[in-house]
Regions:
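Alpha/beta-hydrolase fold nucleophile elbow
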Residues: 75-87, 107
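Short glycine-enriched nucleophile-adjacent loop
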Residues: 91-101
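Serine-hydrolase catalytic machinery in alpha/beta-hydrolase-like enzymes
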Residues: 1-62, 66-76
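Alpha/beta-hydrolase-fold catalytic nucleophile elbow
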Residues: 30, 85-87, 110-111, 137, ...
Length: 209
């Protein structure tokens, strides 16, 4: 789970409140530059002057070659399912990762930055790399912005859900709408995504039996 600042504690509290009896390992990692390290490719600034440097591939390479193997060795979870969750640009990164590698069987993209330049083209031209459950969420007010770029997030997210529902590797897909704007209850929104993935995991396990 890629995080920013002090949101981990809030996320953990919300997760334990929603799933008090579940057994899971939550690992958070932080990057030096959010716009640089989570953007899948270069793009102009959506607001302000800070552009996106497109170093997401480097972050994913570190995650696959160092981060996940370290977690597997340290906590002996190599045989367990691995999920990736993120909020905002980190949510986009998590979703993009599912199109780029076959490690993650669950993705939670919460208030994802699907307004990112050319993401609409990318998602139409790619399919998931493995069987995967995908949770999407968005705040009801997020698309109601004067920023023309960010105002596309609603339609982009709806189209993303539609494409995933048509993807043969997508086992379960949902788009959940939350009250409020982009910065409302980020920890709780992430926790809801993990809870949904957990519920779908048990549904699939029971179905396979």
């Amino acid at each position: 789970y890629p995080h920013q600042g002090g949101e981990v504690e809030h996320f953990c509290e919300a997760l334990l409140e929603l799933m008090p009896e579940q057994n899971f390992l939550l690992v958070a990692f932080q990057v030096e530059d959010w716009n640089r390290d989570f953007s899948p490719w270069e793009a102009p600034a959506a607001f302000g002057t800070e552009a996106f440097d497109g170093q997401g591939a480097r972050t994913l390479k570190w995650l696959l070659e160092e981060g996940v193997p370290y977690i597997d060795r340290t906590y002996h979870v190599k045989e367990q399912e691995h999920w990736l969750a993120g909020y905002s640009l980190a949510g986009l990164f998590a979703l993009w990762s599912a199109y780029e590698c076959d490690i993650f069987s669950g993705i939670a993209c919460c208030s994802g930055s699907l307004w990112f330049k050319n993401w609409d083209i990318y998602m139409r031209e790619h399919t998931l790399k493995r069987k995967c459950s995908v949770y999407l969420s968005l705040g009801g007010k997020e698309e109601k912005t004067k920023n023309a770029v960010m105002a596309t997030v609603g339609d982009r997210t709806r189209e993303q859900e539609k494409l995933l529902l048509e993807d043969s590797f997508a086992e379960r897909v949902v788009l959940e709408w939350n009250p409020g704007g982009h910065f409302a209850d980020s920890g709780k929104r992430l926790a809801k995504g993990i809870k949904w993935l957990m519920e779908k995991r048990y549904e699939l396990k029971n179905y396979e039996k």
